[in-house]
Amino acid sequence: MNYKPNIFYWSPFLVPIATPKAVVNSATALQNYGKKYECSIINFFGEFNPYQNELKDKNIKLINHFSEKLLKILPKHGKLQSRFSFMVIFILSFFPLKKLISNQKPDFLIIHLITSLPLILLIFYKFETKFILRISGLPKLGIFRKFLWKKALSKIYKVTCPTKSTANYIESLGIVDKEKIITLYDPIVQISKSNFQKKKSINLPFEKSEYFFTAGRLTKQKNFLFLCKAVKRIILDVPNFKIVIAGEGEDKDKISSFIQKNELEKHIFLIGYVPNIFPYIFSSKGFILTSLWEDPGFVLIEAASCRVPVFSSNCPEGPKEIIKDNFNGLLFESNDENDLIKNFSKFNKIINNNETKKKLILNNLILARQFSLFNHYLKLNEILSNGCN
């Protein structure tokens, strides 16, 4: 029987975000297309329990440690509260993770979230395992953190980045050899799965194609309060404008208060966290993204795979790189309300013209295919195969 390299994924998280989906999809891609790897996801606090049936069906192992009861009591919302929780996870996981890597000796450990823990382990201990750091968003490095990263990355096998601009940024920091930096697109598009999911029914108080849609954590990054302020002006020209916002987060009360205070309840609909956003995207007139930064912006790719036109801020790193203005979507200047209003008017005209709308959608669909599970597998398999030689 041929030996199968063991791949461990490290990605502890507190609330549903895009990264865990990327981890599951990455492991799925290796299991489905390669059939020569044994993939396991480290599930220290039961954070991946919602995926356990899916992972079992795909023969992806979960490595459990602490009870999920601990995860339930940790604070999840607010900058200080979430930092406290991450510190608790760091302290409780330090020696168990070291023991796991030392005893199990996986061929590769792919690090997604709470990256500081495995990187510090890499500085102070010697492992047979090759560490792969997955960058998600631009890291903020002070003098001390930059020193630690440089020390750890001297022993890292590879650093993978979700966009070319992020790869260029990491290279510019001078903290890791250029040869170790690789652009690896996230595994987002799974056409068969999204085609099935988008057909599920949704419950909204209006007809299909009467609304625009957006989704994400209700945080400063997603800039939804800015969007609500823009809606207040948009409805002066488009009185029947409606937008559905899916997500939870620390800014929810602030956003809800603004909607009520400005009597926008018939135009802005907060529907909370939705496990399956595909039918909401598919039934919408278009997808709007107002983020201050994304890397790359999962929902943009998911909207493209649903054949829905995209209107996005030109924020770094993903949207600015992924969306080509007037080619596969329309852009507006990030956090500029006047520019959003001006360009939304153009966007509305484009999507109300079948010919221009089809061109926009087709171009975006073609671009989205580079974020398929198969393309992710091809690149990651190349990285892993070189490391096995």
For each feature predicted by the language model, list its residue ranges.
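Aromatic "clamp/platform" in nucleotide-sugar-dependent glycosyltransferases that forms part
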Residues: 273, 292
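A short, active-site helix/loop in glycosyltransferases that binds the activated sugar's phosphate group
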Residues: 156-181, 188
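Short hydrophobic beta-strand element within catalytic cores of glycosyltransferases
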Residues: 309-313
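Conserved acidic donor-binding segment of nucleotide-sugar-dependent glycosyltransferases
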Residues: 325-326, 330-338, 346-352
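A short, well-ordered alpha-helix in the C-terminal region of glycosyltransferases
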Residues: 355-370
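A conserved mid-protein helix/loop that constitutes part of the nucleotide-sugar donor-binding site
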Residues: 17-28, 210-236, 243, 250-256, ...
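N-terminal strand-loop element at the rim of the active site
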Residues: 9-17, 29-87, 180
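Short His-centered aromatic/hydrophobic patch
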Residues: 89-93, 111-117, 135
